[in-house]
């Protein structure tokens, strides 16, 4: 089996314009190289199914220029600017602003109260503002042109497949790629703890809006304070590693 892991059935089932073809050498001899079949979809990126990938949008030139001008005038980091520019080029939604990182140098109990105050005082749009922004207006969907096979060609291909003409060899089994183990770093653990803190602060704000905040407030405060202490321990561990220090435990 070839290293490209394409059998005859998969290559023959592709449309005519996507078939792998050989290019003759300059001296007119045997074909030199074999081109791989192109990705058959223009809307769905390689490496995933359409159900898990949102449809791409085409930003107008005026919208893209306005967003780039606002980014240029604002005080954003280079990482956020690159993310916004990549979203404009790929037609993806703009990245959401991240909540402020808690100050682990302060007392965990005081920092917990500050986090809950920020979540409680966050401004939210009411129904009238959401309707005025046009969020509930439905736009007419026009499916884009694709490169699928024509009806007669697809029928004939289905007939050949059902007749068993292009069935694959059962002795040939595709190779499975070995799973790559992802190493979890201290920064990943800190980001996960920050997400848990923000989720609990927002949930407590919703409970307070329904009049149930007093019932869950002590428990949520303890959970947020405990996660802040874990973040402090992870940050001190990262600082010790960066300084080249080691700690021995009996």
UniProtKB/Swiss-Prot annotation:
It holds the Pfam family UPF0193. Residues 86-110 are annotated as: Disordered. InterPro entries: UPF0193. It comes from the Eukaryota. Belongs to the UPF0193 (EVG1) family. PANTHER family: UPF0193 PROTEIN EVG1 (PTHR28348:SF1). This is UPF0193 protein EVG1 homolog.
């Amino acid at each position: 089996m070839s290293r490209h892991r394409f059998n005859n059935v998969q290559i023959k089932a592709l449309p005519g314009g996507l078939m792998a073809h050989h290019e003759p050498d300059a001296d007119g001899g045997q074909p030199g190289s074999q081109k791989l079949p192109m990705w058959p979809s223009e809307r769905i990126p390689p490496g995933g199914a359409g159900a898990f990938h949102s449809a791409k949008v085409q930003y107008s030139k005026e919208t893209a220029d306005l967003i780039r001008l606002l980014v240029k005038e604002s005080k954003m980091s280079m990482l956020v600017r690159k993310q916004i520019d990549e979203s404009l080029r790929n037609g993806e939604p703009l990245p959401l602003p991240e909540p402020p990182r808690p100050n682990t140098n302060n007392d965990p109990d005081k920092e917990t109260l500050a986090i809950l105050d920020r979540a409680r005082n966050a401004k939210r749009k009411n129904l009238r503002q959401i309707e005025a922004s046009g969020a509930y207006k439905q736009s007419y969907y026009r499916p884009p042109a694709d490169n699928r096979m024509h009806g007669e060609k697809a029928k004939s291909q289905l007939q050949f497949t059902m007749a068993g003409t292009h069935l694959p060899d059962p002795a040939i089994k595709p190779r499975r790629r070995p799973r790559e183990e992802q190493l979890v770093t201290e920064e990943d653990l800190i980001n996960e703890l920050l997400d848990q803190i923000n989720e609990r602060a927002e949930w407590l704000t919703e409970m307070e809006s329904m009049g149930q905040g007093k019932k869950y407030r002590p428990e949520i405060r303890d959970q947020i304070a405990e996660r802040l202490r874990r973040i402090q321990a992870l940050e001190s561990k990262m600082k010790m590693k960066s300084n080249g220090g080691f700690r021995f435990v009996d």
